[in-house]
Amino acid sequence: VNVTIVGGGLTGLTAAYYLGHAKPEWTITLFEQAPRFGGKIQTQRVDDFVVELGPDSYLGRKTEMTDLVHDLGLGDTLVSNETGQAFVYDKGSIHPIPGGSIMGIPTELMPFVKATLISWPGKLRAGLDYFKKPYQLDKNGDVSIGHFFKYHLGQEMMDKLIEPLLAGIYGGDIYKISLLSTFPHFIQVEQKYGNMVKGMMAAKMSHSKAGVSKAAKDAVAEGDVPRAGKGTMTDRQFESHEAKSSQANFASNSASSSNHVTKTSSNHQSAKAQTDMESRKGTAAQSGMFRQLTGGLESVITAIVEAMPSNVHLHTGTLVSDIRYVDGMYAIDVVNSVNNACGCQSTTDSATEVLLDKAPAIADHVIISTPPATYSQWFKDDAGFDFLRSMEQSSCAIAIMAFDKSTFDGDLKGSGLLITRKTDTPLTACTILNQKWPQTTPDDKVVLRVFIGKPGNDVVERLSEEELSELAVKEIQHIMGFSVKPEWVRINRLIHCMPQYNV
């Protein structure tokens, strides 16, 4: 049996790794267009700094990733984020996020009453949700995030808390983003309790007392996002992006094989991994709900490539230009992604014969782990892919900048801040990395991770990396109130990187 995997990011590599181990008699070939594996995961070493130019962590409750880390022998390098107060910047002022809130939804009276971010009329309007009835969903049981929370909590809460918290995760228009596709548990909570204030209060109480309600756990876990320094490109976006991309797993047999492999991996997790996970349960809630590795997320990519079984053949610099179904098999046209000539660099000693003379690769099954914009073009006559072709994509940029702590004259309270969409800046958030992930930064340095890109603002596509760097420094200096210049800046532009899961 021959299996072809298209895409060498974390999803494609993981599929190859587990499938190769589960089916040693199968031949598995993976094609990656870029000259490197890892996709958006990109870790750089800058002197004594560990710099993440893509996602910087994953949610600890997503145990599949933790299982993989342990399977690769990297369990001892796992660390949790340090928690701290998160803030919101709104039109010239920095305010703490109200205590006792879950994703901006108040669950405790006094912290919300004392909050400086929301005006008294805004607080009273949010409190009226206690008497609200459930929102009337559309025929698909869906509604946009914006319309849902504006109905429950009012315009001011939407603008100052909900939008910077939730819209930033997906980099999109909160009045278009589907609640059912992104935060379905909010609908479940509302339907069960009648409104969001009652529901989130009950969910928090249930979680704190028993810890057995999935809705409560999900709600509280999602509420940890801002406390951990949430930004535009996070594990949540990655997770949804990769999950939606899996719809292109159009060979049904390979899809069922992948499901079997995932279960096999979970069932065969080592006793040591289980023990390690149990030992961390007591401290995870205290130290943060995100996970990182001391060597950066790219250490997972390096380890999984090195640990591939011998029946898996990995190739970089290979572009899949078309996929056709011919006589019960899949024909995959592959060309060199650099000079358009057939050939590739391989991590294995044996070349793949199907690449010779531009002959198509032939496979019994195909697994695709690329963005929708890549694979939807291969199925132009298939109406089932129309929704992918029409899917909007948003862009963002990440700027990492380092300062000497002894000369830094800004306010370093908490883990970071979010920026309201109505504030006149293209920035959406800033994480203080030396306080969120202290192991990534020397003790005498300050590192800021700044996120750029709002709906309707084209600066990420229009400006050069040098211009984006200057813009990010200038804007965050103004917001945080400091004047010192950074020792260095690293920029990563992610053009049309985030599919928009709109209603």
Language-model region placement:
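Active-site/ligand-binding neighborhood in enzyme catalytic cores
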Residues: A126-D322, M329, S337, C344
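Conserved Rossmann-like nucleotide-cofactor binding loop
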Residues: T11, R36, A373
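N-terminal Rossmann-like FAD-binding beta1-loop-alpha1 element of flavoenzymes
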Residues: N2-T29
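Dinucleotide-binding Rossmann-like beta1-alpha1 core, especially the glycine-rich loop
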Residues: D47-L137
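Mid-domain catalytic core of redox enzymes
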Residues: D224-A228, T232, A243, N253-A255, ...
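General small-molecule cofactor/ligand-binding pocket signal
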Residues: V79, H313-H315, E487-R490
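Glycine-rich FAD pyrophosphate-binding loop
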Residues: G20-R45
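Flavin (FAD/FMN) cofactor-binding core of flavoprotein oxidoreductases
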Residues: S469-V503
